[in-house]
Curated annotation (Swiss-Prot):
Protein's name in the database: UPF0761 membrane protein RSc1559
Entry keywords, A to Z: Cell inner membrane, Cell membrane, Membrane, Transmembrane, Transmembrane helix
Annotated InterPro entries: UPF0761_bac, Virul_fac_BrkB
Family to which the UniProt record says this protein belongs: Belongs to the UPF0761 family.
HAMAP family: UPF0761
Residue stretches spanning the membrane: 44-64, 101-121, 141-161, 182-202, 207-227, 248-268
Organism: Ralstonia nicotianae (strain ATCC BAA-1114 / GMI1000) (Ralstonia solanacearum)
Amino acid sequence: MQFDTRVLRQWNVPKLRALQRYALRRAGEDSLPQVAGSLTFTTVLSLVPILTVAFALFTAFPMFQSFRAAIEGYLFSNLVPGNISRPILTYLNQFSHNAKGLTAAGLVGLVVTSVMTMLTVENALNAIWRVRQRRPLAQRVLVFWALVSFGPVLIGASLSVSSYLVSVSAGYVAKLPYGLGVVVGLVPILLSAIAFAMLYVFVPNTLVAWRDAFLAGLVAAVAFEIAKRGFGYYVARFPTYTAVYGTFAALPIFLLWIYVSWLVTLLGATIAATLPIIRQGYWQRRAFPGSEFFDALGILLLLHRARDHAPRTLGELDIGRRLQLEADYVADLLIQLKTLHLVGKLQQDRGQAHWALLCDAHTTTLRPLYEKLVLSLPRLSRTAFAHQLGDTRVLEAQLHNPALDCTLEAVFASGEPGVVKAAAEAAAAPAAATLAASARA
């Protein structure tokens, strides 16, 4: 019996195309190449201070001094292509050694530079997760100080365990089946995946599931390894920078590699941020003229129902899950509703705002909401009838639709069918106005 692939195509091809459109739109919104370039510049300024602070811990704690050489070798053999790792390691060690002779004011400047770079990283990740509320400065500094302080220690401990396992199994790798040697060789990728996952979980000021963070970290680690090998092959086979820059060739090559590294890191962050959306299917939402008005009515209906149950509020993530809408799209609609004094933000829970309905549903009509979300000029410019009705007031003069004078209470009394009916009746007004304008033309 042959399998009919037409059914499979009917279910998967449209979804894959929608997912492709969503991925391209999300990548454009996040501006990953531009953000990676900005982070490259700040990384160059703060790389020496961060390494100075991190490696100073091994001097302060004698029990960890043996880790430093192992960590340096691990970092520059797994994070930097071998063609440029040796001169870069020499320069950074020299710079870090020179930094130890700075005065107190100079050391404060180095620490400030390091913190500013870390804050830039946090801002970039918050933008990818669409987080609008930042942590207090003290908490942000403590989080990054913990990452810089304990990160090398954890890496050193992991390297010690890995070295012990490799030494124990050295005599058995050739005899054991199922590619145990390959498994041992995957330890650096696993460590990189864990490091990426920790970055994605702890840095953004929002709740990130460990499974999403680790899966994205694993993708980033594999992409990082592929990029490292490809970059090393390119530098070895096409020594363009060496021919042009001579002895200074390591600097532009290192800058380019930092840029590629940040690009991979941000790509992994985008994957971690979009996995919940893809898993729930929110990326398949289709936008149409009046869709924001319809979705805003759905949000108001949920908040209206929440009034009867404690705590009488709903979080942005909860609203998005119930309506199957993206978190950033829900946040934008809530801000629009807040400007109309229809809803209010009451509290903040680690990046997730909680909202409540503030307006009187018995007296508030649909007209202000419709004028805000449908008749505003920036939104009209994206609709099909914008070229016929360029002036918002011309369109408004055509709209004598009694459905817009209906109160929210009357709409919500019928539940979801009432919302659909109100949106459908209100959506008839633009079509009527378009026909009238075409008749006059």
